[in-house]
From Swiss-Prot:
The gene is HIBADH. It comes from Bos taurus (Bovine). Residues 1-36 form a transit peptide. Belongs to the HIBADH-related family. 3-hydroxyisobutyrate dehydrogenase subfamily. This is 3-hydroxyisobutyrate dehydrogenase, mitochondrial. Homodimer.
Length: 336
């Protein structure tokens, strides 16, 4: 699989691998000492909505897995498929020297790495630890320091694309860490994503993800507002979506993940906003953006408003629905 990926962007200084490019085996010559063809066990901690399909794609590429999740039921299908399931992150670290974590919050990540039964209790020297959670960049930096003390390598590699891209193996990974280890990380991440982008030092992957989700939240709210206004003005929602998507207002929220029920198939709005990326998680990510904006003295006027909207949604019963349910929220809120 790795041989089907090509290193791009050398002239611009941007390093990323894309499976969409033609194969170029020669591009693998500059890898580090880790074997790109290695099929030794890979640890995977956190097999929820995103982690589950990500882990399955590693299985499809022939990697044996060492699985842990705080909810044992989440591990059952992996156990039934013949993968090893263990009882703590420390047990994962004891059995695997390459580990991927996919967890909901900074607190969960800290516990998985530094807790009483965390990875760092039994991590091996030279291990590669990849965190695909979306967490505070400062937490990533602190975890990297702790991992380095143990003689291992930490990289942050949050994702974009949602559950659909996780299932199809088309996620985008934003990677921060030691550049010399990027190729080793890409070996695994390329099994789960179509784009693996090197962003810089530890924490820059998280920074890129926070910026992406800030824009995503704003564009989703904007799409929901525009669609709601058009419907109230008498436009057919499918027609309006078609017009937006051939005009300058087009965005991912309008053409790929439209928030209006009946406009698109295969998206949460077509399933009562079940599945997808939860409103609670979007509110969490916008909180991270708020914190980063405060620490860097960066004005995020629309981002702050988006944060308040998603927090309000969580308080009004939308916490378990997909974040595109902001359309439903706007329709039901007569105060707007």
């Amino acid at each position: 699989m790795a041989a089907s990926l090509r290193l791009r962007g050398a002239a611009s200084g941007l390093r990323y691998w894309s499976r969409r490019q033609p194969p170029a085996v020669a591009s693998l010559a500059a890898v580090c000492s880790r074997s790109m063809a290695s099929k030794t066990p890979v640890g995977f901690i956190g097999v929820g909505n995103m982690g589950n399909p990500m882990a399955k794609n590693l299985m499809k590429h022939g990697y044996p897995l060492i699985i842990y999740d705080v909810f044992p039921d989440a591990c059952k299908e992996f156990l039934d498929a013949g993968e090893q399931v263990v009882s703590s992150p420390a047990d994962v670290a004891e059995k695997a020297d390459r580990i991927i974590t996919m967890l909901p919050t900074s607190i969960n990540a800290i516990e998985a790495y530094s807790g009483a039964n965390g990875i760092l209790k039994k991590v091996k020297k030279g291990s590669l630890l990849i965190d695909s959670s979306t967490i505070d960049p400062m937490v990533s930096k602190e975890l990297a320091k702790e991992v380095e003390k143990m003689g291992a390598v930490f990289m942050d590699a949050p994702v974009s694309g949602g559950v659909g891209a996780a299932r199809s193996g088309n996620l985008t990974f934003m990677v921060g860490g030691v550049e010399e280890e990027f190729a080793a990380a890409q070996e695994l991440l390329g099994c789960m994503g179509s784009n693996v982008v090197y962003c810089g030092a530890v924490g820059t992957g998280q920074a890129a993800k926070i910026c992406n989700n800030l824009l995503l939240a704003i564009s989703m709210i904007g799409t929901a507002e525009a669609m709601n206004l058009g419907i109230r003005l008498g436009l057919d929602p499918k027609l309006l979506a078609k017009i937006l998507n051939m005009s300058s207002g087009r965005c991912w929220s309008s053409d790929t993940y439209n928030p209006v029920p009946g406009v698109m198939d295969g998206v949460p709005s077509a399933n009562n906003y079940q599945g997808g990326f939860g409103t609670t998680l979007m509110a969490k990510d916008l909180g991270l953006a708020q914190d980063s904006a405060t620490s860097t003295k960066s004005p995020i006027l629309l981002g702050s408003q988006a944060h308040q909207i998603y927090r309000m949604m969580c308080a009004k019963g939308y916490s378990k629905k997909d974040f595109s349910s902001v359309f439903q929220f706007l329709r039901e809120e007569e105060t707007f």
